[in-house]
């Protein structure tokens, strides 16, 4: 076989070499390196460390901060999944109706998606700390006179609200696209058969929205389990670690306490959780595809 024939046969593979090298160097190598360090007491400050086996994982089981972070992360993730799906469908159905100015409203609801999560959190931090208390004082509304971020329950609610306010923008577009993909003949046939809005949704619209729901589920799951920058800017994990997510906990142990080995153990647990849930969700979603 001549050189020209070899090049012609394998030329396409040469375009994959650079991406594969980059993926190995910047994804797979750090991933396996992090998994290795999770079995050490590495501080990140020197090259000296001791192999401690599964000791870091044993400590996790009795770490109050870790358990608290697990609880908040699960609450946040569940709220985002339910909120983005339910609100996304409701708003998408409203925007799909024949209303005046729907182009404006579609752009309005999508606007939060183009903003930086950090910027949104910093803006809402000022609103919760100064804006709402000022309004509460002016109107004599007692529960608004103090910052929501000053109490554990208030900070949790504020965190969910901010992430949901920005996170629901993309699901609205996805659900709107799904609704517009429904053949008009099917909708008209349902109307002729006497189906009301509720019956049309459950029997006609929902089956076409299932692929979008599956995608939104994964997006919300990832956003909840990996939440970091918004929480970091909005509450910093406080008060009293009530809004510390797993991502923020990894950051605190790694960069504030210099416990890189322990932080990698938490990160690996988070990676495994996301992987398992994602695989199960993808398999289940295939059973409901139209």
Swiss-Prot record:
SUPFAM superfamilies registered for this protein in UniProt: MetI-like
GO cellular-component term (any): plasma membrane
Domain of life: Bacteria
Keyword Transmembrane: yes
Subcellular location: Cell membrane
Keywords: Cell membrane, Membrane, Sugar transport, Transmembrane, Transmembrane helix, Transport
UniProt GO BP: transmembrane transport
Entry keyword annotation includes Transport: yes
Chief localisation class: membrane
CDD domains: TM_PBP2
Parts of the chain that traverse the membrane: 12-32, 72-92, 104-124, 156-176, 201-221, 231-253, 260-280
UniProt membrane topology term: Multi-pass membrane protein
Ranges where the ABC transmembrane type-1 domain occurs: 70-281
PANTHER family assigned to the protein according to its UniProt record, in alphabetical order: ABC TRANSPORTER PERMEASE PROTEIN, INNER MEMBRANE ABC TRANSPORTER PERMEASE PROTEIN YCJO
Described function: Involved in a binding protein-dependent transport system responsible for the uptake of melibiose, raffinose and isomaltotriose.
Similarity annotation: Belongs to the binding-protein-dependent transport system permease family. MalFG subfamily.
Protein name per Swiss-Prot or TrEMBL: Multiple sugar-binding transport system permease protein MsmF
Organism: Streptococcus mutans serotype c (strain ATCC 700610 / UA159)
Gene: msmF
């Amino acid at each position: 076989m001549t050189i020209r024939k070899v090049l012609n046969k394998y030329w396409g593979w040469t375009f994959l070499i650079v991406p594969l090298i980059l993926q190995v160097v910047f994804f797979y190598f750090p991933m396996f390196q992090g998994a290795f360090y999770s079995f050490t007491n590495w501080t990140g400050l020197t090259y000296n460390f001791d192999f401690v086996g599964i000791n870091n994982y044993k400590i996790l089981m009795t770490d109050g901060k870790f358990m608290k972070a697990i609880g908040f992360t699960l609450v946040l993730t569940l709220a985002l999944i339910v909120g983005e799906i339910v609100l996304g469908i409701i708003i998408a159905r409203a925007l799909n109706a024949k209303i005046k100015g729907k182009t404006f409203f579609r752009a309005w609801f999508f606007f939060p998606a183009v903003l930086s999560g950090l910027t949104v959190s910093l803006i809402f931090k000022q609103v919760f700390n100064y804006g709402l208390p000022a309004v509460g004082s002016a109107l004599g509304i007692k529960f608004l006179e103090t910052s929501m971020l000053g109490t554990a329950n208030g900070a949790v609610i504020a965190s969910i609200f901010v992430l949901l306010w920005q996170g629901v923008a993309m699901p609205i577009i996805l659900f709107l696209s799904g609704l517009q993909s429904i053949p008009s003949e099917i909708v008209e046939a349902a109307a002729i058969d006497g189906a009301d809005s509720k019956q049309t949704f459950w029997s006609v619209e929902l089956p076409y929205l299932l692929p979008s729901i599956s995608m939104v589920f994964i997006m919300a799951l990832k956003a909840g389990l990996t939440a970091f920058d918004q929480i970091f800017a909005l509450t910093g994990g406080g008060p009293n670690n009530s809004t510390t997510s797993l991502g923020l906990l990894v950051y605190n142990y790694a960069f504030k306490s210099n416990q890189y080995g322990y932080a990698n153990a938490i990160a690996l647990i988070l990676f495994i959780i996301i992987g398992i849930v994602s695989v199960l969700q993808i398999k289940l979603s295939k059973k409901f595809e139209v």
